[in-house]
Amino acid sequence: HLLVVDKPHFLPVIPTGRFVQQSLLVRLKRTTGIDTLSPIHRIDRETAGLVLFSVRPQDRNAYQALFRDRQVHKVYEAIAPHRADISMPLVRRSRIEEDPDGFFRMVETLGEPNSETHIDRLDVSGAWARYTLFPLTGKRHQLRVHMNALGLPMAGDPFYPRVRRGPDASEDFADPL
């Protein structure tokens, strides 16, 4: 019923833009021969992690409903600067919308919160710390926006706090998110 895949940093889950053939879905269909594969959820192209695929079309909606109804508890880890002045654990709630001034970026804005992330610091090594992130909502770039807004931009993030390369620039796999 399910196929669980460990997605690398650079690969989008579904075909998009210049990544039509080089997407996780297209690669899996070619490799497995299962044409009915469909992602149950997505993670950002720059993010590595587990992605669930439905094998049978008749099961897809039931699995997607688990994510939609927030019955799946997602956990992420991130490396970001250590700031002793920020007490952990904490909950970040904010309104996230598309940045009108930035290509494919999101920003926190005033208004009713539409995103929530629970954040804790796992350990510290010099100027860096490892954090665990529990998103309760699923806005685009939510974890990256929340960490950046706290003054804790994730190591290797190509968009936050500033765009490090344009949409047509070549990939730099030496410094992943």
Give the predicted meaning of each segment.
Residues 1-177:
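RNA pseudouridine synthases
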